[in-house]
């Protein structure tokens, strides 16, 4: 179902339900469409908040995992969110890790689904073929447990992003940042209760 995207204090976000705050951080593609099922379920128990991350709005120097993490911190401060249950998917999981390491005082629990931040598999078995729609469709379908999740609308979105020169450059910047920003040596500093969700096998970089 479509959700109202609010625009306050220069932040765009979805907010549904009541209760303790559950903040969802999306990956590179899909944003709200990837979280519809989660929003619908958790809004019955939590105040579910999904900030729209400025993945393609930041300048190239700040198109990094750290740059997105700073945005998330500003968002939580602006909304005065405390004791947050933070859930991050893929690149959003990496951003969540960086945030909780720098600002643990605001986070009550951490959930990571297919998070980047430990090991990156490059671009899989080949480089992205920007003009090949079928290639992009197949790679997008591989991102999900159920390939049907990759609707034509989502594939069209990914195809459009990949074929936009400026956005493609920022994707590369984010991907390189994720590879450089390995957090393996810092994970023992996280004291919040943490749930890890990971597929048995993956052939994709954990950014989507």
State where each predicted segment sits.
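N-terminal cap/lid segment of alpha/beta-hydrolase-fold proteins
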Residues: 1-10
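Conserved HGGG/HGGXW glycine-rich cap/lid loop of the alpha/beta-hydrolase fold
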Residues: 9-58
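Active-site loop/oxyanion-hole signature of alpha/beta-hydrolase fold enzymes
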Residues: 14, 40, 49-87
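Structural signature of beta-strand start/N-cap positions in the alpha/beta core
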Residues: 21, 47, 82-85, 106-109, ...
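Conserved alpha/beta-hydrolase "nucleophile elbow" surrounding the catalytic nucleophile
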Residues: 26-28, 84, 88-93
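Conserved loop-alpha-helix segment in the C-terminal half of the alpha/beta-hydrolase fold
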Residues: 38-42, 189-208
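Flexible "cap/lid" loop of the alpha/beta hydrolase fold
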Residues: 94-138
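Conserved alpha/beta-hydrolase catalytic His-Asp/Glu region
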Residues: 130-192
